[in-house]
């Protein structure tokens, strides 16, 4: 099984932090979002200044006012929080399409297949954290680990504004000293039962066999056996996985010039290739769309034996489909290229590439980074130019 790299991002006191950002007079003060004292509501978020008084999310507003009588209570503005959240999630999706939202201010990201393009998981986590602060003026706590459970724990240990990476070789060292209540499923009552048994830290679980924990606590006991050892098989489940990625262009003037049309097809194919690599997908196949001046439209599709993101492979097949289906009967008005179905990088593809093919595949993310830094078309593979008839 391929080793996964999961990032958990949790914004720090999100709603309250947005209010403090937008109103400098609130900075450094105990801000409580959710309503005003006397209402029958609950706390939606509390700034860290308010948390020092014991105020927590989901607490009644009445209790929050009792604990923090000098707190600044704000009804909140969900529309504003939603807009900020959308900006943050757009940042996430620039690094991977595998984003599982937990709430407006929290998400899991599977960046296993994004490392060729953006570097190791820890580097991606730091980039995301930096981008969030630069673009929203808000802090986030980020955890990077081999699975969702460990990534969430990692994001919690250094809050607020924290960063923590748990590597496969230090999972047990990371878990050992943590109190048992850090494990999912351990509430106050369960904590008391475990403490009565002498189990106070995660390491204490390691002395107990699985059958004993299952007999004592049922399915929860079995879960605790695995979690205490850092084992979690759950996958990051995106809100939605796109089925295709495409580009099309309506020509400024209808044309029957095949060389000109193939040039446009090449540009579209390279743009689709960049999009695949940026979004973390391979193309399982490719479709070419040809709309004639009469508005008659042809769409032809071909499947790849091996899903790919390589521009030369994409273009060779797109060119074949175009030439087999356009015979110059009428000028072309529109041409388009679509990669479909999409295969997420890191899953769903049987790797059979080796030698030169694998080196070629790994070369494209490097070309993308150079072109991103110095401008598109700064670097283009000679093979692309040869296929297009331009080299």
Swiss-Prot record:
Family according to the record: Belongs to the DNA polymerase type-Y family.
Keywords (A to Z) from UniProt: Cytoplasm, DNA damage, DNA repair, DNA replication, DNA-binding, DNA-directed DNA polymerase, Magnesium, Metal-binding, Mutator protein, Nucleotidyltransferase, Transferase
Cofactor(s) essential for the protein: Mg(2+)
Cofactor binding description: Binds 2 magnesium ions per subunit.
Record domain UmuC: where: 6-187
UniProt cross-references to Gene3D superfamilies, sorted A to Z: 3.30.70.270, 3.40.1170.60, 5' to 3' exonuclease, C-terminal subdomain, DNA polymerase, Y-family, little finger domain
GO molecular function: damaged DNA binding; DNA-directed DNA polymerase activity; magnesium ion binding
Protein species of origin: Carboxydothermus hydrogenoformans (strain ATCC BAA-161 / DSM 6008 / Z-2901)
Protein's job: Poorly processive, error-prone DNA polymerase involved in untargeted mutagenesis. Copies undamaged DNA at stalled replication forks, which arise in vivo from mismatched or misaligned primer ends. These misaligned primers can be extended by PolIV. Exhibits no 3'-5' exonuclease (proofreading) activity. May be involved in translesional synthesis, in conjunction with the beta clamp from PolIII.
GO BP terms: DNA-templated DNA replication; error-prone translesion synthesis; SOS response
GO cellular component terms, semicolon-separated: cytosol
EC top class, as a word: transferase
Site (Substrate discrimination): 15
Its EC number(s): 2.7.7.7
Catalytic residues in the record: 106
Protein name: DNA polymerase IV
InterPro entries attached to this UniProt entry: DNA/RNA_pol_sf, DNA_pol_Y-fam_lit_finger_sf, DNA_pol_Y-fam_little_finger, DNA_polymerase-Y, DNApol_IV, IMS_HHH_1, Rev_trsase/Diguanyl_cyclase, UmuC
